[in-house]
């Protein structure tokens, strides 16, 4: 048994999805999917990346990974026909196809969003949802702002200038915006973009962007939840109150929403209905309690419900115990079907802190709550053979109980509970055919292929005439330039994070600054020798887009590489420093941004920028 653990070293490429698909295929072939200690698992750079994605913090999904409406979805029926997969039963296999329940999940979500305004007669208010007509991923939004198509942006806990890629392009985009709203706990490069090095006094006079800065609360200054990569939904308690005039997120967002709705009521608008009819049934509308929000996301009954199999009844107004209770007739609401069961009539499952692990498999079933259904290992039916017996009898997860005619185990079975092994139901219940897939529907082909980064020092050895991903998105503004070895860019550069710093935040914290006080460029010993470079000397790193200046840290950690018979060097630069922070404000850095070096190139599936491999030249500063 073995797991594959990855982080942004795999994802931040123009072919990142291809790399992860390769890992998934390998684990399927090895039988390591659905088994404790197996799978393909992501290490996240933030503590709640999983939760943000679950709740649709990206443009192309709704909460619970429901598909977003598109312009051709003229009504709810059309939307469901497009997004609800048809069950496929290959050969002798049966299929559960749990996404066939999409209508129940979608209607319950619309009821949570619009309450009484969502009725069968008006298609459950489906047409209140915006229709996504193009790619609104992060890089595209900033590119549109640069081109003058986006007039303003809300940046909540997001330092857009630093995040990149091509920070200079992001700075220039903000110069063209009409307005910018930043909610942060420190002044940062985005909220003070006009202070970027290189902006002249004359240019400053021409920047007409109105900037609003809202004092937010840090993660320790508010209640809330984190969802880790194992899908554990865990409640956290406030450690200390926000200082001064700082406010928690829900109070800030509710204040803005209520004011916008008030303006729509007074002044009308092109299509005010979604704003005017948004359901906001909270005890304190100006500062909704997170417990109320969590209960709404879990879901509740809007009418008395009865399970025909067990005769169990749930009264109107009661919390739902699980997503099997969700209906498509308007009698239930739920903000995210995957979280249904997290806050029930029995209480807040997400606040549990039981440390017992009777199976010894690291399941910890009573610690917080894991979606879906408190299941700790997804697709755990695959841990058994065709007869329902565990492949590893000493590490049993689930199994078929012939006497009880049901699946039982140390974990919640991820399967149709009463489907006996003889029915040959496929274990991968979220796929319409119930099987694991070696071929998938990706934008760049059904099977992984090796591609080089957009900026690469050699041709692709497999197919030199097509070195990089053929469907990768390359931008064509005047700032979008790409380097080649022929132009003198013959050193590979990568970016990374440090253990001692947390993205672009802790450079404002004296303790972290004491640990690593200033930026550096990590240079291989052999490259430094060839340059006559000593550790501590300043270097200038230049890409086709901009330059970066910092002290060199000469190391043997990054080794020279032999590529196509040639010795090639790679350097590394941590991402954390910019032109605002303790060291920057004390003029102890050059105030350059590492993402001024990186190209605006994104993976065609996940739309992740290519930070991990690009070309530069390096010289003494």
Model-derived regions: residue spans:
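Phosphate/diphosphate-binding loops
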Residues: 182-188, 193-195, 203, 241-257, ...
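Long, contiguous, secondary-structure-rich segments that constitute the structural scaffold
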Residues: 251-307, 408-421, 428-434, 439-461, ...
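Active-site rim elements
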Residues: 10-13, 239-245
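Aromatic-residue-lined binding/catalytic grooves and analogous aromatic/hydrophobic interfacial grooves
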Residues: 5-7, 380
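Extended redox/cofactor-interaction regions of prokaryotic respiratory oxidoreductases
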Residues: 28-210, 215-223, 311-529
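Flexible, glycine/charged-enriched surface loops at secondary-structure junctions
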Residues: 3, 34-41, 266-274
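Glycine/threonine-rich phosphate-binding loop and adjacent beta-strand/alpha-helix elements that clamp
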Residues: 209-212, 219-241, 575, 600
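Substrate-binding/catalytic subdomain of NAD(P)-dependent oxidoreductase enzymes
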Residues: 7-14, 43-47, 51, 294, ...
């Amino acid at each position: 048994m073995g797991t594959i653990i990855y982080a942004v070293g795999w994802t931040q490429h123009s072919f990142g999805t291809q790399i992860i698909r390769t890992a998934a295929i390998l684990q399927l072939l090895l039988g390591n999917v659905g088994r404790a200690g197996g799978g393909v698992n992501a290490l996240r750079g933030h503590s709640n990346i999983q939760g943000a994605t679950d709740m649709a913090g990206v443009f192309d999904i709704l909460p619970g990974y429901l598909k977003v409406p598109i312009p051709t979805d003229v009504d709810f029926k059309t939307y469901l026909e497009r997004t609800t997969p048809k069950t496929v039963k290959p050969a002798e296999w049966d299929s559960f196809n749990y996404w066939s329940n999409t209508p129940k999940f979608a209607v319950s979500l619309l009821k949570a969003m619009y309450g009484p305004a969502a009725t069968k007669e008006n298609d459950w208010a489906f047409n209140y949802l915006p229709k996504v007509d193009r790619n609104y991923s992060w890089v595209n939004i900033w590119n549109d702002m640069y081109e003058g198509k986006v007039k303003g942006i809300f940046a909540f806990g997001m330092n857009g200038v630093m995040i990149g890629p091509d920070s200079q392009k992001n700075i220039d985009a903000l110069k063209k915006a009409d307005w910018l709203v930043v909610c942060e706990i420190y002044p940062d490069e985005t909220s003070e973009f006009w202070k970027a090095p290189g902006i002249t006094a004359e240019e400053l006079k021409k920047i007409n962007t109105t900037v609003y800065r809202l004092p937010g609360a840090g993660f320790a200054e508010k209640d809330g939840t984190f969802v880790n990569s194992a899908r554990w939904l865990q409640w956290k308690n406030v450690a200390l109150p926000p200082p001064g005039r700082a406010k928690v997120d829900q109070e800030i967002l509710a204040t803005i929403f209520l004011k916008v709705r008030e303006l729509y009521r007074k002044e009308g608008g092109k299509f005010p209905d979604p704003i005017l009819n948004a359901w906001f049934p909270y005890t304190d509308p100006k500062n909704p309690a997170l417990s109320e929000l969590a209960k709404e996301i879990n879901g509740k009954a809007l009418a008395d419900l009865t399970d025909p199999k067990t005769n169990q009844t749930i009264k109107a107004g009661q919390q739902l115990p699980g997503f099997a209770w969700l209906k498509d007739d308007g009698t239930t609401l739920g903000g995210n079907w995957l979280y249904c069961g997290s806050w029930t009539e029995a209480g807040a499952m997400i606040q549990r802190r039981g440390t017992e692990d009777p199976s010894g498999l690291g399941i910890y079933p009573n610690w917080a709550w894991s979606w879906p259904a408190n299941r700790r290992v997804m697709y755990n039916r695959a841990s058994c053979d065709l007869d329902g017996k565990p492949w590893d009898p000493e590490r049993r997860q689930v199994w078929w109980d012939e006497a009880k005619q049901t699946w039982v185990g140390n974990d919640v079975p991820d399967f149709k509970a009463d489907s006996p092994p003889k029915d040959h139901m496929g274990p991968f219940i979220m796929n319409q055919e119930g099987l694991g897939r070696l071929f998938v529907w990706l934008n760049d082909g059904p099977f992984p292929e090796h591609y080089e980064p957009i900026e690469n020092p050699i041709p692709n050895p497999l197919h030199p005439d097509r070195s990089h991903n053929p469907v990768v998105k390359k931008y064509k503004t005047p700032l979008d330039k790409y380097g080649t070895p022929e132009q003198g860019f013959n050193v590979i550069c990568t970016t990374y994070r440090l253990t001692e710093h947390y993205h672009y935040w802790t450079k404002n914290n004296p303790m972290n600054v004491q640990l690593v006080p200033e930026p550096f460029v990590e240079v291989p010993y052999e490259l430094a020798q060839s340059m006559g470079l000593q550790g501590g000397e300043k270097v200038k790193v230049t890409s086709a887009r901009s330059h970066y200046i910092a002290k060199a840290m000469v190391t043997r950690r990054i080794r020279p590489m032999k590529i196509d018979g040639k010795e090639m060097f790679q350097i590394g630069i941590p991402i954390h420093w910019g032109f605002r922070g303790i060291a920057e404000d004390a003029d102890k850095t050059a105030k350059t941004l590492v993402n001024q070096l990186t190209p605006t190139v994104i993976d065609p599936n996940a739309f992740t920028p290519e930070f991990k491999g690009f070309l530069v030249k390096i010289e003494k500063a």
